[in-house]
């Protein structure tokens, strides 16, 4: 009987570790800044980002601003050529669409593709911007939106 109890406890512990390992917790901190061809960008270096300057292009709640997106990847990742960017606030599961079906441009500023955009987020706090090329998530950028 002791063997079965030990086996059951071991299996439960193993199952718990498996479930814990599969849980992906997101880090709601502003994405890293990086340089590409002399431009400072916010995002994931060599994957996804947009030109960003914390003084000039900082996000303020309800204010629109221009942002040049840059994408890095293999040619087949850009077959769809249309980009959608959805935004989610850290305190709310509701998603809003910031960019819907905009076409990617050619290489620019060291990136494989680029895309100009106008974006505005409605309230302050941390936001996750999910950028899709076609139906595939290309990456996520976390931004802080300030009160004016």
What are these regions, as identified by a protein language model?
Residues 1-8:
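Bacterial N-terminal signal peptides that target proteins for export
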Residues 18-21:
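C-terminal motif of bacterial Sec signal peptides marking the signal peptidase cleavage site
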Residues 25-120, 133-148:
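Contiguous segments within soluble domain cores/interaction surfaces
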Residues 123-125:
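Short tyrosine-centred short linear motifs in exposed loops/low-complexity segments
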Residues 127-133:
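Short, aromatic- and glycine-rich surface loops/edge beta-strands on solvent-exposed regions
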